[in-house]
């Protein structure tokens, strides 16, 4: 999903020069920023009992004034730092909730909090919602609606990135066996530290894959035999 980064909006020597002269930070020229950490928890029912795993992301969001040239004027841009959720259901069987939205889903992971915590738009502006997320909402847990889900995947062989396959959130049993079902995905604004190192401890090849696709190609192409492995990269797991 295309998004205009905060850096893009601030690009240009003139703006940088003005910021330096004013010395008042980004908000002086109408570039407010908000920062928070959000924890996604994946809960699953299994024959051995309930299982869950979480990951904490750092989120940075900012809006640009309407006077800024370009298509990003007046919009909201966000970026995240952290990693996907990895939930082990059995030896060699791990469910991953990636840093990319599921087909048909929107806003995950960067803008999901704006929609999950303010579904009825009681705070109508992005500025109001950004302020609440940064300063006031802590410990409140909200369930993700289906249209905000991340992409769920697994690997038939954790050492082979080309064995990646999509997991149907409505039918985990088809992938992981009878009695396994997704209970819920929840989001919480937290002060916990950003999750680091867990994904690479499970998928060691992420340390060496670089910027290429999971199937070994350098670019995504419709000619790839394994389209899913050709669509996914390291940034779907770690940012």
Describe the role of every protein-language-model region.
Residues 1-13:
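Bacterial N-terminal signal peptides that target proteins for export
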Residues 12-21:
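Bacterial N-terminal signal peptides
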Residues 29-31, 78:
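Sterically constrained small-residue positions within well-ordered secondary structures
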Residues 31-46:
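Alpha-helical transmembrane signal-anchor/signal-peptide segments
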Residues 48-164:
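Structured domain cores in non-transmembrane regions
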Residues 156-239:
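Glycine-rich, aromatic-bearing surface loops/beta-hairpins
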């Amino acid at each position: 999903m295309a998004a205009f980064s905060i850096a893009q909006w601030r690009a240009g020597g003139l703006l940088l020069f003005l910021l330096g002269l004013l010395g008042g930070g980004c908000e002086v020229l109408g570039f407010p920023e908000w920062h928070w950490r959000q924890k996604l928890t994946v809960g699953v029912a299994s024959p051995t009992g309930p299982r869950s795993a979480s990951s904490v992301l750092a989120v940075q969001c900012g809006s640009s004034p309407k006077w800024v040239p370009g298509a990003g004027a007046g919009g909201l841009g966000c970026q995240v730092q952290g990693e996907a959720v990895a939930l082990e259901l059995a030896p060699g069987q791990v469910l991953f909730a990636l840093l990319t939205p599921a087909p048909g889903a929107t806003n995950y992971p960067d803008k999901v909090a704006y929609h999950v915590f303010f579904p009825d738009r009681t705070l109508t502006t992005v500025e109001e919602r950004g302020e609440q997320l940064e300063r006031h909402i802590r410990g409140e847990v909200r369930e993700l609606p289906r249209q905000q889900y991340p992409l769920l995947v697994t690997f038939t062989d954790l050492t082979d990135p080309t064995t990646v396959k999509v997991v149907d959130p409505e039918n985990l049993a088809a992938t992981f066996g009878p009695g396994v079902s997704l209970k819920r995905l929840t989001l919480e604004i937290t002060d916990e530290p950003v999750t680091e190192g867990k994904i690479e401890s499970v998928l060691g090849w992420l340390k060496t894959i670089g910027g290429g696709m999971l199937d070994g190609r350098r670019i995504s192409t419709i000619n790839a035999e394994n389209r899913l492995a050709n669509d996914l990269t390291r940034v779907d797991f770690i940012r």
